[in-house]
Amino acid sequence: MGIRFARALTGKGPIAADIDDGRLAAAQNAGAVATYNTRDETAANRLMVETGGGVFAAVDFVGSEKSFAFANGIVRKGGKIIVVGLFGGSMSMPLPMFPLRALSIAGSFVGSLAEAAEMMRLVRGGMIDPIPLEKRPLSRAGTTLDDLRAGRVTGRVVLTPD
């Protein structure tokens, strides 16, 4: 969904990074112009070279130590990292790096009412395809949580009564 909204709002295809090739393929299908598997140790360096010095902004939809570290490694001077995901962990960064890199870090859990209205305008206007949705019986809740932790879910899973 992030890829679709970024493309609709900017008119440009964003870049996607993930640990799962299936989700990277889904990102390409949604309009990502490039994808990087973050399990590849060369991914951040390749992205830096291919973008001419890094990205201007990164949205961390996971919110883990590893995903934040990757975002921090690919954002150029003056860039911004927006953490949306709630996976958990902590970050550590020398304080002088903030002013030296002119780096901004923000958290976002919900947007404003105006942003929600804009989002719905895009959805109603047919500019955003629905998110992939899989229904599973409630009895598979444990397996579903394991799949989420392992990064095997693309889109959303809805648990329904057995």
PLM feature spans:
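Residues in the short beta-alpha loop(s) of Rossmann-like NAD(P)-binding domains
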Residues: I19-D20, F87, G111
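C-terminal hydrophobic helical "lid"/dimerization subdomain
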Residues: D21, A69-N72, L113-D162
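Helix-to-beta-strand junctions that scaffold the AdoMet/dcAdoMet cofactor pocket
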Residues: V75-R76
